Every structure is written in structure tokens, then in C-alpha cells.
């Protein structure tokens, strides 16, 4: 145990997805509540916590490099997060790490911090933590994590082995957190989990309570309640269950944003079966058509994998044909990468790297054309934009169709009479394949 005579300082490195970011926020909130200072440099810190990602091999490598940098620069390091579930792999590369915990092991992380850097004596009234906790996002938007883990066993994914099966947060707790965020000035809530549409499945959608009123633990009920807060609500990681159809009318009514992040992964029934994903492409196309009829303003985001083991040119062509017909607004594409522990590693007919690269390029070229055409349809129209930043050149914001960091932006050149978090009406004047330009109305 170190002898710390000053106000103890903790360095923090957060890697990976928004779900990991929320875990980091929770740990930082507890540390600040206990009187620890959180510092931005290794030099000033008595210890460094690295919250890791282990989803794909490149993320594992990034996490191991971050741990190594923290050890070199500081020497005292605690590791947590998804890669922490693979302690042997970390110890093999970095045996000097003090402690290692898996994901969502908040209490263990704090216990380890207390052991090496004892809790300070502090006046809680002099180190007040905001009621909404420490946030790593800008003040006007926040991620709202509604569950942990996943019940699916997709062959390319190891999340269940690291984060376990689905565990839904009580709906009263989720809604109370959302209310605290709104009271603190948040204008946009991004609902996240490993599987947002499965919310409540593990508790058989039991009835919970919020403000003394009964509320069903389900995605649809959650959306209905969040709509009463008067902010933008955006849904991410929505597995395409049949009941997803039930949230589309809420979007059409303006209760939640007309935005659906629904990872489809592929469009060949054979490849989807190998992935252990839903395989009826025709049914999915029919649903997309129906959703757009109900909510014409709907923005659809999805992710796909090319070069999955066994993928033939015919399978890939099915994927391109799907893109042409579905005309999705926002699309991410990944070249299949083996992940240690994933069932897909054992599948035959691995696709050569040069073929993956060639297919990825063809995929992106087609989707960029589709995205550009979709955005071109907005030129001349008026849209609502939430402002993210303002500088000497103007303002940058996002439309209802744009999630932070992963989607496009709306540029308001020369606009300075706004501030982050403002929601303004903008006339779109120009578009490319990702972004829009316009002027405030």
C-alpha cells in the first residue's frame, strides 16, 4: 500500500464503445464522490485505471498498448473492462499490472484503488459531484445504459463470454437516471445496451414503478416514458425482433427520434445462418418498407460484415443487392476479423484478406453512392439541428438522422449566435455522401 500524503489523484483511460464509456463514468463518479481527484496525465497520478475493450483483435491490441503506456509512464496500473475477462492474456504481456477485473466490476475496482491509494479524508460539501454523476460526453447529450450482457450467441462475437447473459436494469432506475440527466441540461439521450430490443426479457417484462406509477419493463414502455421528458431519444443496438415494429408509430408521432440503429450483419441466408443471425432477408425488406410507410422520416443505420468464413461471391452479391433495395441511410462495414474465443474461428473456408479488402471497397463504394443520394433528397428542406460545437468559422451540429461520432454532421458556416445544446431550424443548401451544409432559418 502506498503512503499518499496529498489529495490522491487517479489517472483514467477509457477505450471502446459507448457502453464502456458509461462504465467509466460510473467508476469516475464513485471516485470523485470519495474525494479522489481525476487527472488527465500519467505524471500527476498516484495510479492509473485502464478500462479496456476486447471485442475484436485490433481492440485487444489497442488495449494492451494502452496498458503498456500507462505502466511505462506511471507504473501503477489497474485494468478493468472487457479484456479484463482474459486475465492470463494481459498477465502474459504485462505481468506488472497490479490488479485485473472484468467488465462491470465497479466495486472490485474501487476496492483495489482503496488498497493501493487509500481513501482521502475530505469534506463532501467541498467536492460536490453533480447529481447526474461524472459524464465524459458533452453536457447536452448522454448515453443511457439500460441493460448488461446478451442472450444471443452470434458466432463472430464474444460479448456474452465477457459480459454474461442479459441483465436488465429496473425500469424505475433507468427512468430516474434519465430524469436526472434532463434536469442537468441534457437535450439528447442515446439508449444503449448490448441488445436494446431485448430489454426486460430476462425479467419476463415484469411491471416496475416510476414516480409511484406502474411501468412495464420493455423497450416500448421505456420509449413511451422517455418521450414525456421533452428531449431527443435515440435508440441504438436494436436487434430486429418483431416487436421493434411497435416503436415505429412512436417515431411517427414525434415521441422519440425517427432513428433506428439495427445491426443486420449480412443478407445471404446461408451466411446469416452461419452467424446465428435472423435469416429472412425478404421479411426484413418488407418490414423496412412498412416502417417507412408508417414513418417517412425514419433514418435507418446498420452494420455489416464482409469476408465472413464461407462467404462466396454469390453471397456477397446478395448483400450488394440488399443494399440497393433497402437504401439504408447510414451504414458501417467491417472486414471479418477472427476474435479469440469466437465460434466462427472454427468455420471452414476462411476468406483471404485481399478478397475481404476488395469486397469491402465495393461495398463502401455502393453505399456511399446510396448515402449521397439519400442526403441529396434533403437539399432545400428545413430540418432541426442540435448544436455540438461553435468556433470562429461557425457551428457544427447534427440532425435527427445523425448520432454523435458515428454518423454525419451539419455545418452552419458563419453561424455564431448559437451554443452547444441549442436545437435550431436549418435550411439544407448542400450535401455530400456523409454531411450536410445549411443556414439557420
From Swiss-Prot:
Its EC number is 2.8.4.4. Residues 136-373 form the Radical SAM core domain. It is an enzyme of class 2 (transferase). GO terms for cellular component: cytosol. Keywords: 4Fe-4S, Cytoplasm, Iron, Iron-sulfur, Metal-binding, S-adenosyl-L-methionine, Transferase. Its cofactor is [4Fe-4S] cluster. [4Fe-4S] cluster 1 binds at residues 17, 53, 82. Residues 8-118 form the MTTase N-terminal domain. PROSITE patterns: MTTASE_N, MTTASE_RADICAL, RADICAL_SAM, TRAM. Binds 2 [4Fe-4S] clusters. One cluster is coordinated with 3 cysteines and an exchangeable S-adenosyl-L-methionine. Pfam families: Radical_SAM (PF04055), TRAM_2 (PF18693), UPF0004 (PF00919). The keyword Repeat does not apply. Its main location: cytoplasm. CDD domains: Radical_SAM. It catalyses: L-aspartate(89)-[ribosomal protein uS12]-hydrogen + (sulfur carrier)-SH + AH2 + 2 S-adenosyl-L-methionine = 3-methylsulfanyl-L-aspartate(89)-[ribosomal protein uS12]-hydrogen + (sulfur carrier)-H + 5'-deoxyadenosine + L-methionine + A + S-adenosyl-L-homocysteine + 2 H(+). Catalyzes the methylthiolation of an aspartic acid residue of ribosomal protein uS12. PANTHER family: RIBOSOMAL PROTEIN S12 METHYLTHIOTRANSFERASE RIMO, RIBOSOMAL PROTEIN US12 METHYLTHIOTRANSFERASE RIMO. This is Ribosomal protein uS12 methylthiotransferase RimO. It comes from Escherichia fergusonii (strain ATCC 35469 / DSM 13698 / CCUG 18766 / IAM 14443 / JCM 21226 / LMG 7866 / NBRC 102419 / NCTC 12128 / CDC 0568-73).
